[in-house]
Protein backbone atom coordinates (compact mmCIF):
# COMPACT_ATOMS: atom_id res chain seq x y z
CA UNK A 1 0.00 0.00 0.00
CA UNK A 2 1.51 3.33 -1.09
CA UNK A 3 2.14 6.18 1.35
CA UNK A 4 -0.61 8.40 -0.07
CA UNK A 5 -3.08 5.52 0.27
CA UNK A 6 -2.52 5.09 4.01
CA UNK A 7 -5.13 6.65 6.27
CA UNK A 8 -3.88 8.01 9.59
CA UNK A 9 -4.56 5.59 12.43
CA UNK A 10 -6.58 8.18 14.34
CA UNK A 11 -8.83 8.73 11.31
CA UNK A 12 -9.21 4.98 10.82
CA UNK A 13 -10.16 4.50 14.48
CA UNK A 14 -12.71 7.33 14.26
CA UNK A 15 -14.31 5.94 11.10
CA UNK A 16 -14.55 2.40 12.46
CA UNK A 17 -15.99 3.69 15.75
CA UNK A 18 -18.59 5.69 13.84
CA UNK A 19 -19.54 2.64 11.75
CA UNK A 20 -19.91 0.42 14.83
CA UNK A 21 -22.14 3.02 16.51
CA UNK A 22 -24.21 3.46 13.34
CA UNK A 23 -24.68 -0.29 12.92
CA UNK A 24 -25.81 -0.74 16.53
CA UNK A 25 -28.07 2.31 16.66
CA UNK A 26 -31.00 0.52 15.01
CA UNK A 27 -31.02 -2.44 17.41
CA UNK A 28 -30.49 -0.30 20.52
CA UNK A 29 -33.24 2.07 19.39
CA UNK A 30 -35.61 -0.85 18.87
CA UNK A 31 -34.87 -2.19 22.37
CA UNK A 32 -35.63 1.24 23.80
CA UNK A 33 -38.90 1.41 21.84
CA UNK A 34 -39.89 -1.98 23.21
CA UNK A 35 -39.17 -0.91 26.79
CA UNK A 36 -41.26 2.24 26.31
CA UNK A 37 -44.16 0.14 25.03
CA UNK A 38 -43.96 -2.10 28.11
CA UNK A 39 -44.10 0.96 30.36
CA UNK A 40 -47.01 2.61 28.56
CA UNK A 41 -49.24 -0.22 27.31
CA UNK A 42 -51.43 -2.73 29.15
CA UNK A 43 -52.82 -4.44 26.07
CA UNK A 44 -51.65 -8.06 26.09
CA UNK A 45 -50.94 -8.26 22.35
CA UNK A 46 -48.98 -5.01 22.40
CA UNK A 47 -46.90 -6.16 25.36
CA UNK A 48 -46.19 -9.47 23.62
CA UNK A 49 -45.06 -7.54 20.52
CA UNK A 50 -42.84 -5.33 22.71
CA UNK A 51 -41.19 -8.35 24.36
CA UNK A 52 -40.62 -9.97 20.97
CA UNK A 53 -39.11 -6.73 19.64
CA UNK A 54 -36.75 -6.49 22.63
CA UNK A 55 -35.71 -10.15 22.33
CA UNK A 56 -35.03 -10.05 18.57
CA UNK A 57 -33.22 -6.72 18.76
CA UNK A 58 -31.06 -7.87 21.67
CA UNK A 59 -30.04 -10.99 19.72
CA UNK A 60 -29.18 -8.90 16.67
CA UNK A 61 -27.19 -6.43 18.78
CA UNK A 62 -25.25 -9.26 20.44
CA UNK A 63 -24.45 -10.82 17.05
CA UNK A 64 -23.20 -7.43 15.83
CA UNK A 65 -21.07 -6.87 18.95
CA UNK A 66 -19.57 -10.37 18.82
CA UNK A 67 -18.69 -9.88 15.15
CA UNK A 68 -17.15 -6.45 15.77
CA UNK A 69 -15.15 -7.71 18.76
CA UNK A 70 -13.38 -10.33 16.65
CA UNK A 71 -13.19 -8.35 13.39
CA UNK A 72 -12.00 -5.03 14.84
CA UNK A 73 -11.01 -5.63 18.46
CA UNK A 74 -8.18 -7.33 20.31
CA UNK A 75 -10.25 -10.38 21.37
CA UNK A 76 -7.42 -11.28 23.75
CA UNK A 77 -9.32 -14.17 25.34
CA UNK A 78 -9.08 -16.15 22.09
CA UNK A 79 -5.29 -16.32 21.83
CA UNK A 80 -3.16 -16.10 18.69
CA UNK A 81 -4.97 -18.98 16.96
CA UNK A 82 -8.76 -19.08 16.63
CA UNK A 83 -10.94 -22.16 16.03
CA UNK A 84 -12.46 -21.77 12.59
CA UNK A 85 -15.74 -23.18 13.91
CA UNK A 86 -15.96 -20.16 16.22
CA UNK A 87 -15.26 -17.75 13.35
CA UNK A 88 -17.96 -19.45 11.26
CA UNK A 89 -20.46 -19.24 14.11
CA UNK A 90 -19.76 -15.53 14.62
CA UNK A 91 -20.12 -14.90 10.88
CA UNK A 92 -23.37 -16.85 10.54
CA UNK A 93 -25.04 -15.10 13.49
CA UNK A 94 -24.09 -11.73 11.99
CA UNK A 95 -24.94 -12.40 8.35
CA UNK A 96 -27.71 -14.96 8.09
CA UNK A 97 -31.32 -13.89 8.11
CA UNK A 98 -34.31 -14.62 5.92
CA UNK A 99 -32.60 -13.09 2.88
CA UNK A 100 -28.94 -14.07 3.35
CA UNK A 101 -27.34 -17.51 3.57
CA UNK A 102 -23.71 -18.55 4.13
CA UNK A 103 -22.11 -21.66 2.61
CA UNK A 104 -18.78 -22.59 4.18
CA UNK A 105 -15.89 -24.76 2.99
CA UNK A 106 -12.39 -24.89 4.51
CA UNK A 107 -9.43 -27.24 4.73
CA UNK A 108 -8.35 -26.29 8.26
CA UNK A 109 -9.80 -26.26 11.77
CA UNK A 110 -7.88 -23.25 13.13
CA UNK A 111 -6.67 -19.94 11.73
CA UNK A 112 -4.36 -17.20 12.95
CA UNK A 113 -6.28 -14.38 14.61
CA UNK A 114 -5.21 -11.84 11.97
CA UNK A 115 -6.51 -14.16 9.26
CA UNK A 116 -9.81 -14.46 11.15
CA UNK A 117 -10.06 -10.66 11.23
CA UNK A 118 -9.43 -10.50 7.49
CA UNK A 119 -12.06 -13.14 6.80
CA UNK A 120 -14.72 -11.32 8.82
CA UNK A 121 -13.81 -7.92 7.41
CA UNK A 122 -14.04 -9.21 3.85
CA UNK A 123 -17.38 -10.86 4.63
CA UNK A 124 -18.67 -7.52 5.93
CA UNK A 125 -17.57 -5.86 2.67
CA UNK A 126 -19.18 -8.61 0.60
CA UNK A 127 -22.60 -7.83 2.10
CA UNK A 128 -22.66 -4.67 0.00
CA UNK A 129 -22.47 -6.81 -3.16
CA UNK A 130 -25.92 -8.30 -2.51
CA UNK A 131 -28.19 -5.48 -1.31
CA UNK A 132 -31.29 -7.62 -1.93
CA UNK A 133 -29.82 -10.66 -0.17
CA UNK A 134 -28.60 -13.96 -1.58
CA UNK A 135 -25.96 -16.62 -1.06
CA UNK A 136 -22.39 -16.15 0.14
CA UNK A 137 -20.04 -19.02 -0.70
CA UNK A 138 -16.91 -18.93 1.47
CA UNK A 139 -13.91 -20.99 0.39
CA UNK A 140 -10.87 -20.92 2.68
CA UNK A 141 -7.59 -22.78 2.26
CA UNK A 142 -4.44 -22.51 4.34
CA UNK A 143 -1.12 -24.02 3.34
CA UNK A 144 0.61 -25.34 6.43
CA UNK A 145 3.89 -23.47 6.94
CA UNK A 146 7.33 -24.91 7.07
CA UNK A 147 9.30 -24.27 10.23
CA UNK A 148 9.55 -20.54 11.05
CA UNK A 149 7.36 -19.48 8.12
CA UNK A 150 3.82 -18.11 8.29
CA UNK A 151 0.75 -19.93 7.04
CA UNK A 152 -0.28 -19.02 3.49
CA UNK A 153 -3.93 -18.08 3.25
CA UNK A 154 -6.24 -18.06 0.25
CA UNK A 155 -9.84 -16.93 0.61
CA UNK A 156 -12.63 -16.66 -1.95
CA UNK A 157 -16.10 -15.25 -1.26
CA UNK A 158 -18.56 -15.74 -4.13
CA UNK A 159 -21.72 -13.62 -3.89
CA UNK A 160 -24.74 -14.92 -5.81
CA UNK A 161 -28.11 -13.24 -5.88
CA UNK A 162 -30.40 -10.69 -7.49
CA UNK A 163 -28.81 -7.32 -8.35
CA UNK A 164 -25.30 -8.59 -7.52
CA UNK A 165 -22.73 -5.84 -8.06
CA UNK A 166 -19.20 -4.84 -7.15
CA UNK A 167 -19.69 -2.22 -4.40
CA UNK A 168 -18.79 1.24 -5.67
CA UNK A 169 -15.31 2.33 -4.63
CA UNK A 170 -14.24 -1.01 -3.13
CA UNK A 171 -11.98 -2.04 -6.02
CA UNK A 172 -10.15 1.31 -5.80
CA UNK A 173 -9.66 0.88 -2.05
CA UNK A 174 -8.29 -2.63 -2.56
CA UNK A 175 -5.95 -1.26 -5.24
CA UNK A 176 -4.52 1.29 -2.78
CA UNK A 177 -5.92 4.43 -4.38
CA UNK A 178 -6.07 7.81 -2.60
CA UNK A 179 -7.80 7.67 0.81
CA UNK A 180 -9.75 10.93 0.42
CA UNK A 181 -12.88 9.06 -0.72
CA UNK A 182 -12.89 6.72 2.29
CA UNK A 183 -15.94 7.19 4.51
CA UNK A 184 -18.04 5.07 6.83
CA UNK A 185 -19.24 2.95 3.91
CA UNK A 186 -15.73 2.11 2.67
CA UNK A 187 -13.79 2.05 5.93
CA UNK A 188 -14.10 -1.73 6.41
CA UNK A 189 -12.78 -2.30 2.88
CA UNK A 190 -9.83 -0.06 3.73
CA UNK A 191 -9.30 -1.86 7.06
CA UNK A 192 -9.26 -5.20 5.23
CA UNK A 193 -6.77 -3.83 2.69
CA UNK A 194 -4.48 -2.63 5.51
CA UNK A 195 -4.59 -6.03 7.20
CA UNK A 196 -3.92 -7.76 3.89
CA UNK A 197 -0.97 -5.51 3.10
CA UNK A 198 0.59 -6.13 6.52
CA UNK A 199 0.20 -9.90 5.98
CA UNK A 200 1.71 -9.80 2.44
CA UNK A 201 -1.66 -10.64 0.92
CA UNK A 202 -3.62 -8.94 -1.85
CA UNK A 203 -7.34 -8.30 -2.18
CA UNK A 204 -9.41 -8.09 -5.34
CA UNK A 205 -13.08 -7.76 -6.28
CA UNK A 206 -14.75 -8.32 -9.63
CA UNK A 207 -17.52 -9.98 -11.63
CA UNK A 208 -17.51 -13.71 -12.24
CA UNK A 209 -20.32 -14.20 -14.75
CA UNK A 210 -23.45 -12.97 -12.96
CA UNK A 211 -21.79 -13.36 -9.56
CA UNK A 212 -19.38 -11.16 -7.61
CA UNK A 213 -16.11 -12.62 -6.36
CA UNK A 214 -13.86 -11.31 -3.60
CA UNK A 215 -10.41 -12.88 -3.46
CA UNK A 216 -7.63 -12.77 -0.88
CA UNK A 217 -4.36 -14.47 -1.82
CA UNK A 218 -0.59 -14.24 -1.29
CA UNK A 219 1.32 -11.54 -3.15
Q: Would you name each region that the model predicts?
A:
Residues 14-34, 39-41, 114-143, 188-198:
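Conserved ATP-binding N-box helix of the HATPase_c
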Residues 208-215:
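Glycine-rich nucleotide-binding loop
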Residues 147-187, 217:
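Glycine-rich/acidic phosphate-handling loop/turn and adjacent ATP-lid/helix
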Residues 73-76, 105-109, 172-179:
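Short hinge/gating elements
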Residues 200-207:
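Glycine-rich ATP-binding loops of the HATPase_c
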Residues 38-50:
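Conserved catalytic segment of histidine kinase HATPase_c domains, centered on the N-box/ATP-lid region
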Residues 5-15, 99-127, 131, 179-181:
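Conserved short strand/loop->alpha-helix "switch" segment adjacent to the catalytic nucleotide/phosphoryl-transfer site
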Residues 47-101:
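Conserved DHp (HisKA) dimerization/phosphotransfer helix of two-component histidine kinases, i.e.
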